[in-house]
Amino acid sequence: MAHSIKEVKALLKEIHNLKALDASEWNKDERKGVQQAIASRRKQLEKESALVAHYEEMTRYEENILSDNPEAVICGIDEVGRGPLAGPVVACAVILNADHAYYGLDDSKKVSAANRQKLSEALIEKTTAYAYGIATPEEIDDLNIYQATQVAMMRAIENLNVTPTHLLIDAMELPLDIAQTSIIKGDAKSVSIAAASILAKEHRDTYMRQLAEQYPGYDFEHNVGYGTKAHLEGIKRLGIIPEHRKSFEPIKSIVLEKLDI
């Protein structure tokens, strides 16, 4: 007796690679429903295969470090929030498990909000260590955004409960006596930096949503501090708040105008 289409779909889910799917007896079944199920499973497996291949490519920096020193403790570091008009810059330092396989990791800007949340939850549950570092709007104004970002990153490293031996950093060098590799667009090239990017983004977005409750009218829950139309309109109506960066335009001009300078 032939299997039902539903049964075939269930059996196809037990096939976990394209080679096995190509060799499956179900390819000989000419029923339209079976062929559609095979095509659907093939698409899923191709997507999974692409994720694995991309992930393996993003482990290249980590693998090179470990090939030289198998005992290396690698820490990925990234930040979010350099460009907004309001809110802190948030950095995250992450030390992944040795057997990590967080497929789907990528630059946080390329990952959907839903997938970013899932990845963040998985990372928080399974990483060896992670910690955040924050530089406030006041510190950004007193220093500059570059130096404030360095401060946030160093605080994240200091807050770790594990001491790293090699830092992988997204386009930044830190004045620390620890081996480090600065990688341009590192959040798209290193799984460790991508993990830090995801966690930093989720952490800062959560903070900005909370700030939206404290300061309604600026649309922080959507713009997370960036200079969107709704945010700028909120500034015109309500004025600036302590979380605004006074060294960033147009906030700077508004402050000077009020001081009549």
Swiss-Prot record:
Q: Does the keyword Transferase apply?
A: no
Q: What is this protein called?
A: Ribonuclease HII
Which parts of the sequence belong to the RNase H type-2 domain? Answer: 72-260
* UniProtKB keywords: Cytoplasm, Endonuclease, Hydrolase, Manganese, Metal-binding, Nuclease
Which sites bind a divalent metal cation?
78-79, 170
Q: Which family does it belong to?
A: Belongs to the RNase HII family.
Catalytic reactions on record: Endonucleolytic cleavage to 5'-phosphomonoester
Q: Which Enzyme Commission numbers does its entry carry? A: 3.1.26.4
Gene3D superfamilies (UniProt xref): Ribonuclease H-like superfamily/Ribonuclease H (3.30.420.10)
Kindly state what the record says about how the cofactor is bound: Manganese or magnesium. Binds 1 divalent metal ion per monomer in the absence of substrate. May bind a second metal ion after substrate binding.
Mind telling me which InterPro entries this protein's record contains?
A: RNase_HII, RNase_HII/HIII, RNase_HII/HIII_dom, RNaseH-like_sf, RNaseH_sf
The cofactors it requires, by name, are: Mn(2+); Mg(2+)
Record carries keyword Hydrolase = yes
Record GO biological process: DNA replication, removal of RNA primer; mismatch repair
UniProt enzyme class: hydrolase
GO molecular function, one example?
RNA-DNA hybrid ribonuclease activity
